Amino acid sequence: MKIAFHSYQLGDRGTEICLHKYAKYNQQILGNESVIISTSSRPTPTLERFEKDFKTILYPDVWQNTGSNPELKNTLEKIVSEEGIDAFYAIKGGEDDDFMPENCKRLAHCIFRMDEPHGDVYAGVCKYISDKHGGTHPYVYHIIEKECPDEDANLRSELGIPDDAIVLGRHGGADTFNLSFVYHPLIKALLENKKLYFLFLNTNKFYDHGRIIHLPWTMDPRKKAQFVNTCDAMMHARFDGEIFSLATAEFAVRNKPIITWDGHDPHYDRGHIEVFKDKAFYYKDGNELFELLRNIDHSKLSGNNWNVYKDTYSPTAVMNQFKDVFL
């Protein structure tokens, strides 16, 4: 079977990381052929990586967020016909944007919403998003695995961080460390707990202090592994929560616990909390966060198994799910 894997762009964020894994293990585990399809109308920072591993086809058409993409659909139908594609997989927001080719099986994999069913299979990226929309549609998890499993180095010496320091880190979208009530207790705890450091990768600055260290974004998986290795835990503070969080997963697979808001506001997605359950530290407000950070020590963070992803989200488990749901 020949499967086309489509994304709206070949960017450097989690969507394309997941796309690459599905395409990779579609070949290695399911024994199918994978082809990558995307657009040349947007930046393609990961194009070389995809071209190294798969036949990669770029089309010039521009996707329109209007619910109608007839020109793009025609282009994709020609590619499907010329390449002998059996199934067209698209990782997407979840809206029916009417671009998927109609001359093969259409597989829609939804990241953010599941209220506009379309295609031959309409599935979410996790149980949480399926349940959020009534549980009527299936789901296929993202593959979570430890990148660069042999990498055990960290950045403490390079950054001048003492071995006995407690380092809380985070990475993700630059503007998604945005739960505003956390800033004051975080700074207050930093001033009281002299062993506390914050290490932020690709994160907008909110306070200047010698023990708050900012690093630029990197696509290098080994550098990201060294960054996570430097940390004792992840400090999570995203205003709208998580449907499925790859950033928290990257910490958990290296056995680093997550500190996150136990929010119940209507806007707050609790997908990450449903995954972690009791394998995380939670705060309900600024006071709880301050007490947690002021009193945090290595004994509370080490010696436990924080990896909640090792079985259900493995390549074999997920690709078997992929086969059952999509194929």
How should these model regions be labeled?
Residues 66-72, 203-204, 212-228:
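Conserved active-site histidine-acidic residue motif and adjacent donor-binding/catalytic loop
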Residues 257-264:
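Short hydrophobic beta-strand element within catalytic cores of glycosyltransferases
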Residues 14, 284, 297-327:
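A charged, aromatic-enriched C-terminal amphipathic alpha-helix characteristic of glycosyltransferases
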Residues 7-13, 21, 25-70, 204:
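N-terminal strand-loop element at the rim of the active site
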Residues 225, 248-253, 267:
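Short alpha-helical segment that forms part of, or immediately flanks, the ligand-binding pocket
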Residues 84-85, 226-243, 256:
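Acidic donor-binding loop of glycosyltransferase active sites
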Residues 142-210, 214, 221:
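Conserved catalytic-core segment of nucleotide-activated headgroup transferases in glycan assembly
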Residues 120-150:
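Donor nucleotide-sugar binding/catalytic pocket of nucleotide-sugar-dependent glycosyltransferases
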